[in-house]
A protein has these predicted regions:
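Conserved Rossmann-fold dehydrogenase catalytic segment
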Residues: 107, 135-145, 166-182, 201-208, ...
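Aromatic-enriched alpha-helical interface/lid elements that frame and gate functional surfaces
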Residues: 211-287, 291
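Flexible, small-/acidic-enriched active-site or ligand-binding loops
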Residues: 316-360
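Glycine-rich beta-alpha junction loops
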Residues: 19, 105-106, 178-183, 220, ...
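Conserved PLP cofactor-binding pocket of PLP-dependent enzymes
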Residues: 285-309
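N-terminal helix-loop segment corresponding to the beta1-alpha1 unit
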Residues: 1-167, 350-360
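Short Gly/Pro-enriched turn/cap motifs at secondary-structure boundaries
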Residues: 38, 203-208, 213-214, 320-323, ...
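Oxidoreductase and adenylate-handling cofactor-binding alpha/beta cores
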Residues: 151-171, 184-195, 237-244
């Protein structure tokens, strides 16, 4: 959340525990004993270490809040309240403050006091139940989607609250639950359950409601083909020399193609296995059929399209040195999308500067 806000121009002061700082400082991989994981998410921020149970440090924190637009916290609900720093404690002192809380289960409900990590909410939110293949053990999504979606929704909430404050002059409290965010992104799966009482199952790469829309074997690997409507299916049949299938009643509509997708996939893969993925991608792209290879991380990062979009940026840490990280996908016409981003702070690196500015 705060990385996105920093990329969009916000000044971000990261308040960390004096006892080792943010947990992610200890997560690998490491560059000269510094976490590349932490550094990639905290470029361009400032760091101050405060023990919020300590009266002097708490006073510093309140002085910072006096000149702050937004407070973002992700403690277990009730933690900051114990220290006299909850929303109800602060809203009268700082009436313009936007106070954003992101937690595992939110500030209300029977589970509100429980701790959570990304994988816990992936499991409880239903996402893992539709990920992977049938008859395999539960599969985690390959990235921390529970953390990421909560960060994105919190960022949207903060920007909405800032806009509202322009009209009302008042701050507000934002409550985002990681579990809620998993429910919010279930799209087709939750629509199927709520409308038809069907419990969706994992389907590998196949889309449950659009066909053909999955990964197919080629001569050397796999290709993603996403023929999302009848016109695209017609183009695909022509490109694959499948004119008989175009007129086959089993494949006349999207609903019928979904019903008979196993049969259609066998036919398509017989055609696709004569060429490699690169050749098929070039051929189908000429026909404007949505398709693409399945890249590993190296291939994805080295993709000229990614480089052209400044999606791999440069930053710096005084011990680790220069290193690269993922960039900002939000491109705005009024702001430069620089390849060079702000430095990564050591724990408590900016203490003197921050205290001088906010406490003098």
């Amino acid at each position: 959340c705060t990385m996105i806000l920093s990329d969009l121009g916000a000044r971000v002061i990261k308040v960390e525990s004096p006892n080792g700082g943010d947990d992610s400082r200890k997560f690998g991989p490491f560059i000269k004993e510094n976490s590349a994981y932490f550094m990639s998410l905290n470029r361009g921020k400032e760091s101050i270490a405060l023990n919020l149970k300590n009266s002097e440090d708490k006073k510093i924190f309140l002085n910072i809040l006096n000149k702050t637009d937004v407070l973002v916290e992700n403690f277990k609900p009730g933690t900051l309240e114990k220290w006299g720093l909850g929303w109800k404690d602060l809203r009268d002192k700082f009436p313009k403050l936007i106070y954003a809380s992101a937690s595992g289960f939110g500030q209300t409900g029977p589970l509100k006091e429980l701790p959570a990590y990304d994988m816990v909410v992936q499991g409880m939110g239903g996402l893992m139940s539709v990920t992977g293949h049938p008859q395999t053990e539960p599969t985690r999504v390959g990235t921390s989607i529970g953390d990421i979606t909560a960060a994105l929704f919190t960022t949207i909430g903060i920007n909405s609250a800032l806009y509202d404050r322009e009209k009302t002059g008042k701050g507000m409290f934002i409550d985002v639950s990681m579990l809620d965010c998993q429910i919010a992104i279930l799209e087709n799966a939750i629509a199927r359950y709520l409308s038809k009482n069907e419990i969706p199952q994992p389907m590998g790469s196949r889309h449950p409601s659009i066909a053909p829309f999955e990964a197919f074997k080629t001569k050397d690997s796999y290709i993603i083909i996403a023929a999302g409507n009848d016109k695209l299916f017609e183009k695909l049949c022509n490109a694959l020399d499948m004119k008989a299938e175009l007129n086959n009643e089993k494949f006349k509509t999207n609903a019928l193609r979904c019903k008979n997708m196993d049969e259609l996939k066998l036919i398509m893969e017989k055609k696709l296995k004569v060429l490699n993925t690169k050749d098929w991608t070039q051929k189908l792209e000429k026909d404007k059929i949505p398709c693409g290879p399945i890249f590993n991380i190296k291939d994805a990062v080295e993709n000229p399209q990614i480089k052209a979009r400044n999606m791999i940026i440069n930053t710096f840490h005084k011990v680790a040195g220069d290193f690269k990280a993922a960039g900002n996908p939000i491109k705005m016409s009024s702001y430069a999308d620089s390849l060079k981003r702000g430095d990564v702070p050591d724990l408590d690196e900016n203490r003197e500067k921050i205290i001088k500015e906010f406490c003098s």
